[in-house]
Design a protein with these regions (language model features):
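S-adenosyl-L-methionine
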Residues: 1-114, 173, 238, 242-257
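Cap/insert and terminal regions of metallo-dependent hydrolase folds
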Residues: 206-212
Length: 257
């Protein structure tokens, strides 16, 4: 019965466009921001990734900072960070999922955040295009570039997305070098960082990374450890008992000599 009621409510909210009804985010890094009612109402009701949100708030005064949000989904963290950097800062949000990107841009416009720059692409170690796995649900938070050896379900229509290299965007002046980077890209963080190695070396931003695979863990450490970063676990996001995969970590650079 509960599933039936959920489907009926879902259909009603979408057909009447009440899913776009404006609400306010109640708590967390984006507290007070304008938001849309449905879906993913936990974003505005509160209780979503509380540990990670506390770390974002704990960054303190980030006025004027540049922040990158890799895997922004609907933009909860992008909006929250942009409200804190203010117009002298810049927040760059990467979201290749077209459904999620549309909602991200809606939330940007609802809050008048002209210094939040949404980019409808994934980031990787080389520019190009790639197949994006959705498993028939573009509203999921787990749509992703393929994991190593993963093959697409033949029943799901393929979606192709752009791939961009972060160092190229910085070199061209399209985006600023970051003070902070949040990464939740479903197993692709090591490739995203490989495409930003020059910027990481020069700018030495603070990073928060959500790990989803052992390959991703090893790849990220292979990039950040030689740069003098140290990692601290801040949250478990999948009930994982593994030491690192399935957890969120904050990476801080060692002080410059």
């Amino acid at each position: 019965m509960s599933r039936l009621l959920h489907r009926l409510a879902d259909t009603f909210l979408r057909r009447t466009h009440l899913c776009y009804w404006p609400v306010r985010v109640r708590s967390g890094v984006a507290a007070g921001a304008r938001w849309t009612l449905y879906p993913w109402s936990a974003y505005w009701r509160g209780g979503f990734e509380d540990e990670l949100q506390r770390e974002l708030v704990a960054l303190g005064d980030i006025t004027g900072w540049c922040c990158w949000d890799l895997g922004a989904h609907y933009g909860l963290y992008s909006v929250g960070l942009a409200r804190r950097t203010g117009p002298t800062g810049q927040v760059v949000s990467f979201e290749p999922n077209p459904v999620s990107f549309d909602r991200l841009d809606r939330h940007r416009r609802m809050n008048g955040l002209t210094w939040l720059k949404p980019i409808d692409a994934a980031v990787s170690d080389a520019p190009g295009t790639a197949e994006f796995y959705t498993y028939g649900n573009l509203e999921s938070t787990t749509t992703h570039l393929p994991y190593e050896g993963e093959t697409r379900n033949a029943d799901c229509a393929p979606v192709r997305v752009r791939l961009l290299r972060l160092d190229d965007l910085v070199a061209s002046g399209e985006i600023r070098a970051p003070h902070f980077v949040k990464i939740d890209v479903e197993g692709h963080a090591h490739k995203a960082l490989a495409g930003a190695l020059g910027t990481l070396t020069a700018a030495r931003p603070i990073l928060i990374v959500a790990f989803h695979s052992e390959l991703e863990v090893r790849g990220v450490h292979a990039i950040l450890d030689p740069l003098g970063y140290s990692a601290t676990r801040i949250a478990t996001h999948s009930g994982s008992r593994d030491e690192m995969s399935g957890h969120d970590f904050i990476f801080r650079p060692a002080p410059r000599a």
